[in-house]
Amino acid sequence: MKIRAFVEGLLAEHDDRAPFGDDDPLVNTGRLDSFAVVKLVMFLESEYAVDFARIEFDPQRLDSVSGIADVIAEWRGLA
């Protein structure tokens, strides 16, 4: 899954290689910081053509891999 691999890469940038589940919070626990979230948003815009200006966006939805997948699924339903 591209999403999981990208998140693993973001965590690795901070020497965080601890395992995590798809539903585990990553932002609320501090594993991903605001800069990582910006990189994630840019990745989703370029890789999946998600237009965050066109969807009801709550940054908390990017807190887990499953939340990110839900955002992509919602976008695909609207696009």
Residue ranges of each PLM-predicted region?
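Thiotemplate assembly-line natural product biosynthesis machinery
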Residues: 1-19, 70-79
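Glycine-rich loop motifs involved in handling phospho/adenylate chemistry
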Residues: 21-33, 56-64
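Conserved catalytic core of two-component sensor histidine kinases
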Residues: 38
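Aromatic/hydrophobic pocket-lining residues that form π-stacking "cages" and hydrophobic walls in ligand
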Residues: 41
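Short C-terminal boundary/hinge segments that cap the last helix of small helical domains
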Residues: 50-52
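C-terminal structural segments of small proteins and small subunits
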Residues: 54-57, 62-78
